[in-house]
Design a protein with these regions (language model features):
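Ferredoxin-reductase
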Residues: 1-23, 77-79, 104-108
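Short, Lys/Arg- and Gly-enriched loop/turn segments at beta-strand edges
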Residues: 9-10, 31-38
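Short, compositionally biased
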Residues: 36-50, 153
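Short, flexible hinge/linker loops that cap or flank conserved catalytic cores
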Residues: 36-39, 65-67, 127-128
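Hydrophobic/small residue at the entry helix of a nucleotide-binding pocket
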Residues: 50-55, 142
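Histidine-anchored nucleotide/phosphate-binding helix
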Residues: 54-64
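Reductase modules of NAD(P)H-dependent flavoproteins
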Residues: 71-174
Length: 174
C-alpha cells in the first residue's frame, strides 16, 4: 500500500496515473541509512510515516545478530489508521527482552498510544540520551525536529544518524 504524500512525486503519480493490473519495474532504495547498528550503546529509533521501514530493517538486523543493548522504537503516526507493522513490533517485544516500542499519534488520542509530536513526547519517555545512539527517519521536517529534540536531551552529534526523505530532482527528458 502506498500512502499519498503531500507534494510527493511518486506517491501522487501512483494514485493519479497507475491503473490496477499495470506492471512496474522498481529497484531498491538508495538512501544512506546505516543497515545495522555496530554500536555498543542503547539504540533509539525514531520514525514517522514511511520512515518506519528503514528503522525496522535496522532494528531487525541488530536483533537477529544478537544485539544485547536496549533497542527502543518510537513511531509517530497521524492516526491509528496510519500505523503499520505494529504486530511485528509486538512480536519482537515478546521475543527480544531488550526491544520495546511506543507509538505516538498526532491527530487523535487512543488508548494504548502516546499522544503528540515527537518533540513533545520524547522528553516524557527519555530524560537523558547522552549514552544512546539515535537513528531517525522520515520527512526532512520530522528528522530535523528529532535531531533538535535529542540534542536537547543530551544526544551526541557523532551518535545521531538520519535518513530524511525528499523529492529528488527529476531527470530532464529531451
Amino acid at each position: 500500500q502506498v500512502a499519498r504524500a503531500d507534494g510527493g512525486v511518486t506517491s501522487n503519480w501512483i494514485h493519479d496515473s497507475l491503473k490496477i493490473g499495470e506492471s512496474l519495474k522498481i529497484s531498491g532504495a538508495y538512501g544512506t541509512f546505516i543497515g545495522d547498528p555496530a554500536v555498543d550503546t542503547p539504540v533509539l529509533c525514531l520514525a514517522a510515516g514511511t520512515g518506519l521501514a528503514p528503522v525496522l530493517a535496522l532494528a531487525e538486523a541488530a536483533l537477529r545478530r544478537g544485539f544485547r543493548k536496549p533497542v527502543t522504537m518510537l513511531f509517530s503516526a497521524r492516526t491509528r489508521e496510519d500505523v503499520y507493522s505494529q504486530g511485528m513490533m509486538a512480536w519482537w517485544r515478546t521475543k527480544h527482552r531488550n526491544f520495546d516500542y511506543k507509538i505516538t499519534l498526532t491527530r487523535e488520542e487512543a488508548e494504548g498510544y502516546l499522544a503528540g509530536r515527537i518533540d513533545v513526547v520524547l522528553p516524557k519517555v527519555f530524560s537523558d540520551l547522552s549514552k544512546h545512539t539515535i537513528f531517525a527517519a522520515g520527512s526532512p521536517e520530522f528528522v530535523e525536529t528529532c535531531v533538535a529534540t535529542v540534542k536537547k536531551l543530551g544526544a551526541k552529534d557523532e551518535l545521531i544518524h538520519t535518513e530524511g526523505f525528499f523529492a529528488q530532482q527529476q531527470p530532464v527528458v529531451a
